[in-house]
Amino acid sequence: MRPVYLLDSAILIDHLRGIGPATTWLRTLREGEAVISAITRAEVMAGGSSDERAVAFDLCEQFACLALTKESADRAAELRRAHRWKLPDAFQAALAINQDLRLVTRNSRGFDERTHSFVLIPYSVR
């Protein structure tokens, strides 16, 4: 199956923290339907105890990981200038756009679904 979704770190971190809507949404995915970026992988595996990092590693291993390329770097630079996004957000957007994927995030402040058709915000946390 060709991937459809690029998962932002917030989705996986919410799942690891036991946020129900994240887990529910992730369970709807079919095998191969979603991928993560090297940025997501690093962000998810950066924190926590060694036991928590082991769980995070196992979760990340369930998804193919997209590498950063010079094309995505160039697009990220353009997007950062145009939208004043933080660099990791610009890279996520660039990868999603370049790979024709929906960026799944809950970062509605950075990414507005109404403005950016490549964005999917499947739930919110209050």
Regions found by a protein language model. Name each.
Residues 1-36, 45-58, 126:
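Short, well-structured N-terminal submotif of metal-dependent ribonuclease cores
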Residues 2, 93, 97-126:
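Acidic, PIN/NYN-like endoribonuclease modules and their adjacent C-terminal/linker elements
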Residues 32-34, 61-64, 97-102:
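Short active-site oxyanion
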Residues 42, 62-82:
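Acidic catalytic patch
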Residues 81, 85, 101:
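Short glycine/serine/threonine/alanine-rich loop segments
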